[in-house]
């Protein structure tokens, strides 16, 4: 870790009272209470205006409540303070030649709503999808159980009705059963028997 970066971390932790949270690429991360602070590092021997503002744009796209750009004194010639202030971006100048006293916050960053990180969005989507899937399954199971119980109840009612009819038939007196059976015989049955007797008597 080079000396300007060490001075920068020391200033943010010991002077500004933030907690160092790590480094990702050319960005140092700090924690200020519940807020995340990103400090972009742009230390070079030869500064380019286009590259400087490109880095500022990249910092504004990070999921941080505050963002700073840290540069060496030579970069001040390309800095437009109005642009930094209008966008709420802080500016930190690090002069290694001055040692621990060589870090100065020229422009303080303005707190802004932190962008929601894509990973957090994906996590929320996954949790919501899982919840909806479980609820849908629960509703389907409940509906299926209600339909099953309804069908079983109707089947039992039909069975009981048929059983009652059979029991009524078995409990009926013999005369009624015979009458019921004779009522089912063809009407021409008795007449046919009489004709058979007449024909036999004439033989």
From Swiss-Prot:
Keywords: Cytoplasm, Cytoskeleton
Transmembrane segments: none
Quaternary structure note: Interacts with crenactin.
UniProt main location, coarse: cytoplasm
Role noted for this protein: Part of an actin-like archaeal cytoskeleton. Prevents polymerization of crenactin filaments by binding its C-terminus into crenactin's hydrophobic groove. May act by competing with the D-loop of the following crenactin subunit for the hydrophobic groove.
UniProt keyword Amino-acid biosynthesis, yes or no: no
Source organism (scientific name): Pyrobaculum calidifontis (strain DSM 21063 / JCM 11548 / VA1)
Gene transcribed to yield this protein: rkd-2
Name of the molecule in the record: Arcadin-2
GO cellular component, one term: cytoskeleton
Cellular compartments annotated: Cytoplasm, Cytoskeleton
Recorded domain comment: The C-terminal helix is essential for activity.
Any further remark recorded for this protein: Belongs to a conserved five-gene operon within Thermoproteales denoted Arcade (actin-related cytoskeleton in Archaea involved in shape determination).
């Amino acid at each position: 870790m080079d000396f300007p970066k060490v001075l920068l971390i020391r200033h943010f932790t010991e002077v500004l009272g933030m907690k160092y949270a790590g480094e990702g690429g050319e960005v140092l991360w700090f924690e200020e209470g519940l807020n995340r602070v990103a400090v972009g590092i742009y230390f070079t021997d030869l500064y380019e205006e286009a590259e400087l503002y490109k880095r500022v744009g990249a910092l504004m796209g990070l999921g941080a409540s505050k963002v700073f750009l840290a540069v060496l004194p030579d970069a001040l010639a390309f800095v437009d303070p109005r642009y930094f202030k209008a966008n709420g971006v802080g500016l930190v100048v690090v002069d290694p030649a001055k040692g621990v006293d060589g870090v100065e916050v020229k422009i303080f960053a303005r707190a802004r709503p932190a962008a929601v990180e894509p990973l957090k969005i994906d996590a929320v989507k996954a949790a919501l999808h899982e919840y909806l899937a479980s609820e849908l399954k629960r509703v389907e199971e409940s509906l299926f159980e209600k339909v099953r119980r309804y069908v079983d109840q109707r089947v039992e009612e039909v069975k009981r009705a048929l059983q009652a009819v059979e029991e009524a038939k078995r409990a009926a007196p013999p005369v009624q059963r015979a009458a019921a059976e004779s009522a089912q015989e063809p009407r021409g049955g008795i007449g046919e028997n009489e004709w058979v007797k007449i024909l036999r008597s004439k033989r």
